[in-house]
């Protein structure tokens, strides 16, 4: 099996098992303060390090507390991953906040605001494009 393929398989397994552990395994209350979604998992080529990218729904204070809880549980998570995946050495787990969903939402909001401005300007311009009665009579006389 090619090393790249193995790394991808291990990353997918880590994502699945970590999701399961987030729901049923981690008892730290900080982790359950916000809605946590695993967006991506990157594993190093030697399978010794693992970056887990998470999206956390909630206020900034909640996000930082949830991230602290996840970091505190990383040792437990590493042990469980090693046991569940039957790996000789489980990778070190590092959590990173993924702000991609947040950025996407802000872009969509900006696009919506632009659309509303266009509609407002379009209504104003269409009203100003209407010929006045003097212009209408002038056009009809020629």
Swiss-Prot record:
Keywords attached to this entry: Cytoplasm, Ribosome biogenesis
InterPro entries named in the record: KH_dom-like_a/b, RbfA, RbfA_dom_sf, Ribosome-bd_factorA_CS
Region (Disordered): 119-142
Molecular function terms from GO: ribosomal small subunit binding
Main location as per UniProt: cytoplasm
Record family assignment: Belongs to the RbfA family.
Annotated function: One of several proteins that assist in the late maturation steps of the functional core of the 30S ribosomal subunit. Associates with free 30S ribosomal subunits (but not with 30S subunits that are part of 70S ribosomes or polysomes). Required for efficient processing of 16S rRNA. May interact with the 5'-terminal helix region of 16S rRNA.
Designated name of the protein: Ribosome-binding factor A
